[in-house]
Amino acid sequence: EEGVWLHGAVGWRMPLSGWRAAYVGDVLGWHDRARTHFDNYAASQVTEVPNTISHPAQDSALALARSAKIWGTPQYSNGYICRNPRRNNQMHHYDMNLCYIDELLWHFNWTGDLEYAHRMWPLLTLHLAWEKRNFDPDNDGLYDAYACIWASDALYYNSGAVTHSSAYNYRGNKLAALIAEKIGEDPTPYREEADKILKALNTRLWLPERGHWAEFQDFMGHRRLHEDAAVWTIYHALDSDVADPFQAYLATSYIDREIPHIPVVTSDDVL
């Protein structure tokens, strides 16, 4: 009755706009169901709440670890996509925008539906402006990550420069530029932002001596690089096309070489 994919099939059976579920419709050829999901959450994007409260706008009752749930803050303002379908007045603590938009862009890739891409263009541009406002306010081309991927309940980088969220935003801007060219919009700002992100990833977060990206760089203090990247850092970067072929080889070799491979043992293995 909701017309959207649930967050989980076994546990967490509730609607959520982003994370993984909405990729499945196009993979299975159910493009109509995918489009229904995207339409219902497009109706949940905030469009009439301008950003009137500046950074930082964190909740002091939660040790500043979450955004304050106040309309008009950078997070809860125009561009934000709310957690339930067809309801754009409900706050949630995740950044579900990032995966929802990535799923939508893959839908465009799968279907080649330029008419639909044209209709969703305002949603895409409002989202990209929202991401920039929230997660790259210093305009250095590298984005913070705030509860925005499947492993995200404990992933927040305190305004740091993060590989996986920067990679998502690279792909978002790169494809926005491509779509803009095809529908008669100006691709320049999106192409320039994608170029800036890729350059920053390669100059600040790529570790040539180790053959992979850093997890992130601290925003404060000594601005240290956190060099031991998680698996999600590698596959999100590759999926978002920020690597050249040799970088991709080196980064996947890092997983083979340095990430622990823990065997899964079942009763059949011990009998």
Describe each model-derived feature in a short phrase.
Residues 126, 155-158:
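Extended hydrophobic secondary-structure segments
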Residues 61-65, 147-148, 154-155:
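Short amphipathic alpha-helical patches
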Residues 1, 13-17, 52-54, 135-151, ...:
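Catalytic cores of carbohydrate-active enzymes
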Residues 8:
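Aromatic-residue-lined binding/catalytic grooves and analogous aromatic/hydrophobic interfacial grooves
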Residues 11-139, 162-170, 227:
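Aromatic-rich carbohydrate-recognition surfaces in CAZymes
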